[in-house]
Structure formats: structure tokens, C-alpha cells
Amino acid sequence: MHLMPREQEKLMIVVAADLARRRQSRGLKLNYPEAVAIISYELIEGARDGRTVADLMSYGTTILTREDVMEGVPEMIHDVQIEATFPDGTKLVTVHDPIR
């Protein structure tokens, strides 16, 4: 199987998000990379499902809460930006202050 760099990056996000969700299900609080991976994964999948950029920007702030992450993590993540593939092409999705 030959994957392009963009496809490899998406696959790494999926693996990181899966690991983070497993840790979360064990009751562990998420660290910075785990939180970013989950948010990124949910945004990419939302785009694939046909949601709009505006909808994803709003949805991105509801994926994780302060209770889900380690202390200080919300303050470390100011923006999450991902390039997602929508039915009408690739677009940049930016979520400001995603953990509230």
C-alpha cells in the first residue's frame, strides 16, 4: 500500500485519536497531543460526513471539556486548524479555543 504524505498524516491522526479515546475510556485525563488528535479526528470525520465549515467550527468547541483534559491543557490549545476534505473540495477549518 502506497500512501501520500497527506494520507499518512490523516492515518496518524486516526491512530492517535483511537489511543486517546482508549485512555479516556479508562478514566485518564488527556494530554495536549491526545486532545488535539481527538478534536482533529472529529473535525475530519465531520467534513467527510458532509457537515459545513461553520458547523464544524461550532462543533469543535463541544468535543472535549476542561474535565476531559489535564490541568493547563485548555490554555495550551488556542486554535486547532485542519485541512479537511468536503464534498466540494478541501477547506481549512479553524476552531478557536476548542476546550472550554
UniProtKB/Swiss-Prot annotation:
Keywords: Cytoplasm, Hydrolase. It is found in: Cytoplasm. One of its GO terms (cellular component) is cytoplasm. GO terms for biological process: urea catabolic process. One of its GO terms (molecular function) is urease activity. The keyword Protein biosynthesis does not apply. It catalyses: urea + 2 H2O + H(+) = hydrogencarbonate + 2 NH4(+). Pathway: Nitrogen metabolism; urea degradation; CO(2) and NH(3) from urea (urease route): step 1/1. Its EC number is 3.5.1.5. It is an enzyme of class 3 (hydrolase). InterPro entries: Urease_gamma, Urease_gamma/gamma-beta_su, Urease_gamma_sf, Urease_subunit. HAMAP family: Urease_gamma. Heterotrimer of UreA (gamma), UreB (beta) and UreC (alpha) subunits. Three heterotrimers associate to form the active enzyme. Belongs to the urease gamma subunit family. This is Urease subunit gamma. The lineage of its organism: Bacteria, Bacillati, Actinomycetota, Actinomycetes, Micrococcales.
